Amino acid sequence: MLNKNKRWYLIALYDIYQGLLTTKQCEYFNLHYFKDLSFSEIAELKEISKSAISDCLNKVCDQLLKYEQALLIYEKNKKRNDLYTLINDSELVKKLKDI
């Protein structure tokens, strides 16, 4: 079981990189992380083995981490948002976020 921080981190990465995953990978990720179904429940629903679900979701998580390691989109967004908190001009922050 993932701790909450890693779970939310993977969900954030999924929001960024889901377009790089297959339809099946997205479906299993959604069922597990957003619908909160267990591997067993997904396996029963999709009529495949629990280990196939586990393998697929482990691969998805590995892929998401590799994409972030290479592209750093999440990290750059986080740094940018941290910098926004240092700016006292709310209009400027709004304009920067709109870019």
Swiss-Prot record:
InterPro entries: RNA_pol_sigma_r3/r4-like (IPR013324), UPF0122 (IPR007394), WH-like_DNA-bd_sf (IPR036388). Might take part in the signal recognition particle (SRP) pathway. This is inferred from the conservation of its genetic proximity to ftsY/ffh. May be a regulatory protein. Pfam families: UPF0122. Gene3D superfamilies: Winged helix-like DNA-binding domain superfamily/Winged helix DNA-binding domain (1.10.10.10). This is UPF0122 protein UU142. Belongs to the UPF0122 family. NCBIfam families: PRK00118.2-3. SUPFAM superfamilies: Sigma3 and sigma4 domains of RNA polymerase sigma factors (SSF88659). The lineage of its organism: Bacteria, Bacillati, Mycoplasmatota, Mycoplasmoidales, Mycoplasmoidaceae. HAMAP family: UPF0122.
